[in-house]
């Protein structure tokens, strides 16, 4: 921070800010010298430059320059300045304005601030203020530091260094107030009124002396501090060196054990900073041997917190003394104080490490190994609960841990499939008890899995133990259909039966019979697929299934043909895929929920004949009837809206066989076209007494009957805006020649014109 101090008592002191021009003059100036007549109105200009890039570089100080603009001149150290040429000033230069005794001295006070425990907003405000003041901001304490800025005093390594160097510890508001005082030309504020409060749980404001004490500069004189860790050495060695001590880093065995006999030798303990040390380094043998040797001599290691306590108390009799132990009465309080200060020195904030819990671990990952065996089911249920929130990013680690833990559980089995079966074994047994068996077929693992999936959502468990490509979940209104979905053979056959016999009315007994029939068809289709794959083991109950195999296969083939014909018919009518999807959904819903209306007797007869009698003669009859019915449906299907309205009264008896509740789709063009005019209407409008006949007459305006204006002659000369250099030069030469000719003619006339004035002689 630059300032200009007057050597005479009448003058004052002027402080300079960056980015501002200070004018020295006799009137209406920032620096007034009114009593000197040799001072001009604007005698000289002073300015300070300090780029923001030099804020963290203490070697790049701000620059004060002066520019003279006076009549009688300005001298710097006796040398007269060249007007209008600026000159940089140095600290200690003497500047004289004018020819009389207006002498001033230039002084520079470095302003290097070290910040500690400040948030981002406070740091930004501090940086802006110091840029205007021409100072610097550092993150670490150095020899050039002049102030330590803290909102509340905590015993950190920066605080210890500031106390040793006898530098003030102030709030960041001090520099804001200093900036305003310079701008308003008020007296500078006192830093003692900006000392922050003490924020240490183990220290009281009375016990912490923050005043400047010169004894702290030599607090560690003639002492040698031995560090066993490089990180401690790098952090604490500046404080020891500022206090007049010596430091050394031990990298191996002591070559001279007699060094420890010196009472001024202090070995810094590594036990208080185990969190900072790696496990391999803390167990090195030479560290252990050094500590054992020190203990054998009756000496103790020095905790790093005692360095700060020795500086605060300005004494090394109790602290940093390897031969002196703490008194028994104050041992508990001293240990607590050391814990707080050591944690503060390590981290830069006041935190008691004894209160902090150990690093948190996911203990639930080891629950399967620690709980008794009778609680295995409970732990599995917890895993299923974790699986429900598997999309949460924060629980990904716990999922992986619990997964690995469950696979190592001896009760879980060797594969994930066995574990899934064990998880829901009780539910499967309950399902077998509650669900009556419709057909006595052989139970398989797939049937058990289907039954368990129907009652409980095991898809989450499946995807948890093995990564499979899952299909998208259907809507809630189709959950029943998805859970009881049948193979393609049964679905197509049921669709064919429904197309032939639509539901009309039905009693309660027939509804139960249809549901039993659907279950029988599902189980029989599964058995047919198993037999086709090669499982030819026969049972007493397989006879009924094998009898159904022939008509079912025929039904599949005919249903495929019928569906193809239906698609062609729909394509001719320009129906969309949405119509087919609506029809299929209605059919699936009718299969699952059961028709609430009884069916007509042809369906009853055909179904019973196909399922219960199982006679092969009924299959061709049903197939022929289906084909005839399908052809009738295709032929009699309406092709337009007008035809449909015409056929409704004629085909009233056959409307029951047609699908109901369909969606009618119409395709219309979005392009608006003009209607074609009727020529007959136009011709008729011109005849007779039509009110739309034009009766007005075009009036000729003046000049309408004259000839058009023909452009020609001079109008066709091309207009070029570009300058022609040759033409301009030729014109210029012509003008010069004409002027030269006129000048010559006038000169010739003057030569040949003789009109002398008569001169009168005096007699």
UniProtKB/Swiss-Prot annotation:
A motif (Nuclear localization signal) lies at residues 469-474. One of its GO terms (molecular function) is phosphorylation-dependent protein binding. It is found in: Nucleus; Chromosome; Nucleus, PML body; Chromosome, Telomere. It comes from the Eukaryota. Transmembrane segments: none annotated. The keyword DNA repair applies. GO terms for biological process: DNA double-strand break processing; DNA strand resection involved in replication fork processing; double-strand break repair; double-strand break repair via homologous recombination; isotype switching; meiotic cell cycle; metaphase chromosome alignment; mitotic G2 DNA damage checkpoint signaling. Component of the MRN complex, which plays a central role in double-strand break (DSB) repair, DNA recombination, maintenance of telomere integrity and meiosis. The MRN complex is involved in the repair of DNA double-strand breaks (DSBs) via homologous recombination (HR), an error-free mechanism which primarily occurs during S and G2 phases. The complex (1) mediates the end resection of damaged DNA, which generates proper single-stranded DNA, a key initial steps in HR, and is (2) required for the recruitment of other repair factors and efficient activation of ATM and ATR upon DNA damage. Belongs to the Nibrin family. Component of the MRN complex composed of two heterodimers rad50 and mre11 associated with a single nbn. This is Nibrin. It comes from Xenopus laevis (African clawed frog).
